């Protein structure tokens, strides 16, 4: 899939080195095809790392995607330069009159705070409410998934006694749903979180369907009845070294952190981590774009976007 980015987005060069087709604005302007408009609300502190991971994950179908990165205006980022944000990001005020085929809300390192204590919580609530009418399908990741379940359904999160950290095996629960088409019976995905949403709380809402879960990591993937809201409890977009970098960071801080589960060969953190989740992560993003965005967005929704010239 061609990913359309700004000409000088820093991660563009890395994607091109990986043979991922990245189309800059100049070339895209000469393409007479329908492209998907995807908004990515990037709440992660290392924004450029997350940009790379998600763009890589979106690059595996023939559909052309134009990405708009969105940041919060009520929280000042401390790990990403202001010049980068000003150049490559929009705020909610900038995009609120636009219509998007799909939206992604990322995780954020604020799990141990109550939702209402997060300084940008009101803004995220506004975005999630707006998404009901202005984004045809929204993919929520990790904390973004927990926040979405809390906002839309009132489902609480629970603090874990120990951080859920590593790569866990999951089982597909409902093969009839296109979102898991092509998945193996058992697949792996990374988790890095201090909180969880209990299955018993989800089951109180019959409008939600659990699609995959783990004996060790709990519910991984669920969605509403029409695929407008999809929730992923882990990080299928993570690259090989993301958990390693988090592990080394926390060790340097002197935190009580266990080695990531099922990650290093022979549990030896001097060895190259095993990449066991890339194919299923790619399938998940491809299925979302194809079955819940590209094939489902009605003409009337697209026309709303074209009427206002966005």
Curated annotation (Swiss-Prot):
Catalysed transformations (reactions): L-homoserine + acetyl-CoA = O-acetyl-L-homoserine + CoA
Domain of life, per lineage: Bacteria
Protein name in UniProt: Homoserine O-acetyltransferase
HAMAP family assigned to the protein according to its UniProt record, in alphabetical order: MetA_acyltransf (MF_00295)
E.C. number(s) listed in UniProt: 2.3.1.31
Location (main, coarse): cytoplasm
Annotated positions binding substrate: 163, 192, 249
Important for acyl-CoA specificity (site feature) positions: 111
